Amino acid sequence: TFVHVTHDQEEAMTMADTIAVMNEGQIEQMGSPADLYDNPETAFVANFLGQSNLIKGTVSGNDGDNKIVDLFGQKISLRKDRSHAVDSSIYAGIRPEKFRISRLETATSGNILTGGKVEDVSYIGVSTQYQVLMPWGQELMVFEQNDDGVAPFSVGESVNISWEPSFTFGLRGDEDAEAGTEVNPDEDPDEE
C-alpha cells in the first residue's frame, strides 16, 4: 500500500484503486476512479475530475426506482441511487461524452432535452465537440464520437440532446455549480 499525491487527474485515475479528492484540506469524496467519475457526490468532484454539464432542476416526483426531475419544463428520469440531493432542489449532471446529439426529426430514446441550437463545433479527429445553447440560456457541452457516418452538425442547426437515464447523477441544488473548475493563480499546475 502506498499513498501518491498528485494534481494530475488522469494520472490519479489510471494509477489508483482508490482516490480521495480533497478540497481545502478536507476529503470531498473517496472511492474508485469509476465511482468518482460516474457518480460524483459534489459539484467540486464532478468538475475536478473532468467536464460536467450541471443543469439546475427540481425533483417533481418519483417513479419506482427513479426520481422525476423537471429541467426548465422538460422532464427527465434520475435513478434514486445516483442522487445526492437532500431536497427538491437539484443539479442533474451529465458528462459531455454521455450525450447523443440528433436532428429534431430523429427519434431518440432515454432522457431528452429539446430545442437546442448548435453554437460551436470543434472537430478533433476521434470526436466532435459541440456547444449547444438550450432554450433556458445554458450552453451544454457534447462530445460526439465520429463513428456513426453521420455528417457533423453545423453552427445554427437546431438539435435535441438525449442520453441514457443511468448516466445522470444528481447533486444538491444549493451547491456552487462552478466549484472545482477554478485554478488557483498562486499554483503552477506544471510545477512539480
Locations of regions flagged by a protein language model:
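Non-catalytic connector elements of ABC transporters
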Residues: 52, 62-192
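Short, glycine/charged-rich "phosphate-handling" switch motifs in NTP-dependent
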Residues: 18, 30, 39
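Hydrophobic Walker B segment
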Residues: 13-16, 48
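Conserved H-loop
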Residues: 1-5, 7-14, 32, 34-35, 40-41
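Conserved ABC ATPase "signature" C-loop
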Residues: 24-25
